Structure formats: structure tokens, C-alpha cells
Amino acid sequence: MQADRKALQQQLKEFKTQTGNFSDVVEQVLPSVVSVYVMDWDTGEEISSGSGFFVSPDVIVTNYHVIEDIADEDYFYEEDEVEQVLVETYDGKLRMAEVVFTGNAEEDLALLLITGFIIDPATGEQVESPEEYPPLELSFDVKVGDRVIAVGNPMGQFAATVTQGIISAIREPEEYEVGEDDEDEIAEVKVLQTDAAINPGNSGGPLINMAGQVVGVNTWGLEDADTINLAIASVALDDFLAGFEETFEGEPDEE
């Protein structure tokens, strides 16, 4: 009887997590999500845009394809060779960020480091204004049927947009083939298939469970199927972050 009661309590706990208040979860995660803009600094024109989210107070995850026009793949950037992008935080501040680490095109992940400078909207000049932001926690506990929320900047114009859906399938690399001319776009990582809308500009944003934890990185949606969208699973992101830490710790200290 006691075992049955514990099992029931666990089921109720899981049910409450799955049916959590949607607006509360969104309010919890929005401060950790940013819009990412790749700029031509000579002309001031936007090259591309996407989304990202904080995994530590000053480190942002996004997709590599969001920044591929200015950054090499599978690369650790030294301090004197970084490429800069513009990120817009939840409070509307335009903040400078640096590309510090990229995966290969198949991993499709990249890390940005925010600087202590924002763009003054009145003058367009950089102004020192250091700040830290709340990071999101990763979760590897995901099942088909789980409710999820995709957060991002669709079309590069609608920041902090949220859509909801479920995990439709969990696919290992050998179980799917997506891309032009039958060429895999992501061939090395586990992905989550969801019916939560992922539009251009959503790339790099978080796919969130009802506990406000990241279960995936929104990556792309199929053009001919509105309800088939793919996110890189958080376990692949965790491996990528571990690779960054290993590379960073292996760098020699400056004299």
C-alpha cells in the first residue's frame, strides 16, 4: 500500500510539472532569452538574425548557422581575433557580444560571450554597462508527449515570441535525414521533433519544458510541414559545453 501511495504521489508530481502554468513558465524564462543580430559593421546593415539563451551569467548559446557568415566552424576564438555580434536582451538593451566557440556545421551550436558594453540608442555609441543575466538550467529528462515551449525571435522581428506544443518524437542521428538534395543538415546529434512552431529567427532559442528547463535548442522547421520542427537535444548541448570547457581550460595562461 505504501509503495502504491508513493507511486501515486510521483505520478501527481509529474502531472503537475506537465500541466504547470504556461504564463508562469514563460515569465520565468524570458529574462534568459536574447535576440541575436549579425551585423556588417561597415555599413550598419543586418546580415542575419536568430535567437539565443544564457547558460551562465555571461555566456549565450545559439546555432552556428545564425553566425556562420562571420565565424569559422569548429573553432575556439582567441581574445585578439573575436568576431562581434549584437544581442538584444529581454529588457530591450542592445549589448555587444563576442563569438568565442563554434561547433561544426553538423553540431550547429555556438557560444557567445557578452561584453560590458551596450549601444546607446541616442548616440549609437558603445557605453560601458556591465550586467549579468539569469542562466537557464538543462534537463535531459524528456519523453514523447511532454509539453514544451519554444521561445525566440521569429523572422528577426518579433522578439520574445513563444509557441507551445509537445515532443512528437525523439530521433537519433541515423533516424532522420533533413536538408537540400538529401544532404543531412544535422548528422551528428540527437534531435527532438516537436509541433511547437520554429520559424526563421527562432534558431538558437530554447525549447523549454513546463519546469522552465531547457530540453533542446530550436534549430529549424521543415518548409513543407508546419508541425514538424527540430531542436538539438540538451544532451548534445551539454556535450558541446563540456568540449568548450575542456578547450578553454587547455589554453595556456597569459604571461
Task: Outline where the language-model segments fall.
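N-terminal activation segment of mature serine protease catalytic domains
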Residues: M1-F53, I60, Y64, F240-E254
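Active-site region of chymotrypsin-like
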Residues: V29-E45, T115-L136, A160-F248
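Catalytic-histidine neighborhood of serine endopeptidases
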Residues: S49, S56-P57, N63-E107, G116-F117
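Short, surface-exposed secondary-structure boundary micro-motifs
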Residues: H65, N153-P154, T219-W220
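Active-site substrate-binding loop(s) of clan PA
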Residues: I70-F76, E98-G103, F117-F158, G243
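Beta-strand/loop subdomains of soluble extracytoplasmic proteins
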Residues: E79-V99, K143-I149, A160-Y176, V235
